[in-house]
Amino acid sequence: MHIARIPRTAATLASVAAMMCATLTACAPSGGSAAQSASREGTIAVGLPGSLSTLDTAHETGIINYYVAQVVSEGLLAVGKDGQLIPAIASSYHTDDAQTWVFDIRPDALFQDGNPVTIDDVLFSIDIAKDPDKSPSSAVYWPAGVQAEQSGDNQITITLPAPAVNFGWTVTANGGLWITEKSFYEAAASYGSSADLIMGTGPYKAVSFQPDSKAVFEKSGTWWGGDTPAQTIEFDFFSDENARFLAQKNGTIDIATQLPIDQVSQFQGIGGVSVLTESDRSYVGLTFDQNVEPFDDIHVRKAIAHAVDRSTIVSSILKGQATVATGIEPPDQLGSEIGEQAATDAQAGLPIDSFDLDAARAELAQSKVPGGFSAELTYPSSIPDLGSAALAIADNLKQIGINLTVTSKPIEEWISEVGSGTYGLSFMSYTSTTGDPGEVAGWLLGPDNPARYENVQVQGLIASQAAQTDPSARVADIVEAERIAQDNTIYSPIWWGKTSTAFSSRVTPTQYTPYFFMTPWASSLELAK
């Protein structure tokens, strides 16, 4: 799906996101540099639907940040094409009780400057990852009280305050750990900036970065995983989807990710271009903040939820490239251990405020604002499908007396306001980056959730599911937490999505799966000579 993953804390910098504008010239890049890069032998140019303000994913956890991170950074573990955990900087790991995790550090791992990865570097990186000041967008992945220490010549042990069967995802570059060189980080005035760049262990090293324009990475020659097909990976940032389409058509970019639904057929019509569509295990819905009036009134929340025509949004706006959501966990995400159909069945009975304008009017009449009110719903300009859905919702709300203003914002600004209390009504666009069955619910229903929702029973269930070793029991806890929250209309699920990516004839992905861009994907491209 085309949406971006949004960060897990209200204090995060801007990005998601899936969880990413309309003249025919690119807002960025400029000067024909993308054309030069795509035509240069050994270079792959990737057109992203948005921009980065930093290369430090710990400060900006948008989905396109994660795409970029996979070429330059690694954690202790990584995600394979099947969504399972695989070795990265740790050559192996084990845990007997899901509380004590032992990692054997790869002795041949090097940073991109040729220096070896030391235990001190790994422990330093973990300290940075846990620190909410240094990792404002991702420190929430790390439970309070976690301890990491050296336990052998090339071994570390991480001890959690309580068992967490999903902790393995935390130490991936898809979750909350990007191993860096201590001396490089400490010498940087602003790690991840255009001046300081970034240091990692991945197959490509950062050589230049222009926020809102491009980021360029060259093959490092130091990666433990071996050689990679391209010499250079260039990410070009587009805020104008029409400009990105023209760039693909003219051959100035090789890959375009997260295509808008209404442009998929246009990309398919470009000679030599292949468009691949897969589930991205994403969730889109409305979020209600009970701490903001009048959304503290359940009748107001239900009035709005009843005015959302999910089926029409999916069939018309999304052209069937999504599924009407009955819960917050996409079935292929929730079912990663028990199976997608079992997960679908588990969520089939969840309470949902179905589309019914008469019911919406009745709820509003019982509320503290029976005469209606005005509100604002914002969406990121790089996710036009959200804007179209918002306008459809606004049209329905107008019929019951609620005046909803729909506002487009730069994705950085939009994300910075998520969970901040600025709005009582907001979109949630979340694209999973791991194979953890409880990833979405773990944030949306956990203690630092963007709805600022406090419910002891719900958050107890979220805590207990993380310790469940029985996959079915774990899903049962997650679904029960969803049931309570949806019964109170804290979230109003709309759709579970898919994403489409365009590849030029110069580039062929191998083993393309829903997890492709969450793996070290640059090593899985075949580049035409």
Predicted regions and their residues:
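Detector for C-terminal structural segments
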Residues: 19, 210, 308-337, 385-394, ...
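N-terminal lobe/hinge region of extracytoplasmic solute-binding protein
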Residues: 47-96, 127, 199-200
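Gly/Pro-rich hinge or "lid" segments in bacterial periplasmic/extracellular proteins
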Residues: 84, 173-227, 232
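Surface-exposed binding/hinge segments that line
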Residues: 94, 104, 139-184
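Alpha-helical secondary-structure segments
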Residues: 118-125, 155-159, 202-203, 230-232, ...
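Ligand-site clamp/hinge motif
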Residues: 216, 220-266, 403
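Structural transition elements
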Residues: 323-363, 384-386
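Ligand/substrate-recognition segments at binding pockets and active sites
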Residues: 361-432
